Structures are given as C-alpha cells and as structure tokens.
Amino acid sequence: EIQQNSNTTYRIYDYGRVGADGKPRQLHIDKAVDVTNLCPAKPYPQSEPVDMGGWTKKRLAKCEYFTVDVINVDTSAALEADKSSFVNILVLDGGCVLSSEGNDAVELKKGDSVFIPAGLGKFELTGKCSAVMTHID
C-alpha cells in the first residue's frame, strides 16, 4: 500500500476482534466515509520501458505525492536515495544484492521489501530481478 503519511486510522471493519477489555473495538464508519474520495482515479498513461544501461525502468504511476516505477535489472542498477526521499524496493521476481558504501550487502529475493532511508546516497542492485521502486516527490 502506498499512501500519504498519516497518524490517523479509521477502523471500518475489525473481523470480530476484541480489545484488551474483551469488548469489540470501536469502529469509525462515519469518519471514514467523510474522508473517502469516491471519485474514480484518472488512469495514468503507461510508459514504455526506458533502457538505463544494465536495467530498465517503466513508470507505473506518478502524482504530487509519490512516483512508482517497475525496474528490471539485467546486470546492475546504480541508484540513489537523496535527502529528499526514501526509496522502497519490492522484489517481484528473481533476486539481487543491494550494496552501498559503508554498509553490509543484503541479498534480496522474490517477495522481499527493503526501505532505503533518505540521504543514504548511492546504492546498487546487482543480479537479475524485477522490482517495484517507490519514492516520494
């Protein structure tokens, strides 16, 4: 799930769970309806993959809050997490090694997700994998 940061949670269904007091937890249906946007989303035009030299990038979605790309790494991808945003990578298929200067390398496989903090700087994915890459704008 990709969303704007918020410290508010409205519970609209709770699967019959109960709180520490043994009673059903409070639902927030009216508040959830008040903040729900029921307008259909505008479809984002699909782009063609862009060859980045050793990997490709295809834009899935972009809005004022975040950008989502699918990347396909054939050999290696040199990337960067600058001070303006974290980068999140979710491996869809294959496997790769995430490395950055001064940090231990991390092996990633299908289903793994890694949060790369803002300001980490340059990092590299090496291997052969497909992944969803998200950052805020």
Kindly give the residue locations of the regions a language model identified:
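Short, glycine-/Ser/Thr-/acidic-enriched flexible segments
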Residues: N7, Y65, S76, F86, ...
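Glycine- and acidic-residue-biased ligand/ion/polar-headgroup-sensing regions
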Residues: V73-G102, G111
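Well-ordered beta-strand positions
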Residues: N72, L90, E107, F115, ...
